[in-house]
Amino acid sequence: QLAKLQNGSDIRGVAIQTEGGRSIDLTPDAAYAIGRAFARVLKAKLNKDDIRVCMGRDSRLSGEMLCAALGAGLNAEGASVYDAGLATTPAMFMATVTEGFMFDGSVMATASHLPYERNGFKFFTAKGGFEKADIKEILTIAETLYADGANTAFTAEKIDFMGVYAAQLVGAIRRGTNKERPLEGMRII
């Protein structure tokens, strides 16, 4: 049942019921099982038991609910969870390689350009985004863990990674243009 959530190297599904739309298939129970499975896969990939995972989400209505369930699943497998709140997909990758953060893994809750009722997850380590085979492994494991009534109470430390990431971007643009105010005098149309 969870295997159908695979969309290449992402997980995508319907998280909000709409009139005449597809049935919900990315539920909190599914997100909980996916969180547990991601923790197991990450521990095996890194060959370590104590893992730190950062979660971020876009502004979709279902994001907070799905992250709570995913975070609870991560906690259930012993992962320390850090909540970056509203974030961008590139920022979640950068959270794995930025000094002072260097998370073992990160997850972005997003469905990119898809309609509002959809949502999903993208997974990262310092080596980059998870690939199709990794997602298949997560969903195969999650299927064995899937149960109704999953726990969605989770513990996470809230962090401000977006402020750090934004400062990195500003610095890179200033260095690249050799200007303190590289956009000064330009008009956006």
Each model region followed by its residue ranges:
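Positively charged, low-complexity intrinsically disordered leader regions
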Residues: 1-33
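Glycine-centered structural positions embedded in regular secondary structure
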Residues: 13, 31, 35-39, 73, ...
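Phosphate/oxyanion-binding active-site loops and adjacent basic polyanion-contact surfaces
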Residues: 26-35, 39, 88, 158-166
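Glycine-rich phosphate/diphosphate-binding loops that line cofactor/substrate pockets in enzymes
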Residues: 34-53, 174-184
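Predominant activation on well-ordered alpha-helical scaffold segments within soluble catalytic domains
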Residues: 35-39, 71, 75, 93, ...
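Ferredoxin-reductase
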Residues: 46-126
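Gly/Ser/Thr-enriched, mixed-charge loops and adjacent short helices
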Residues: 119-189
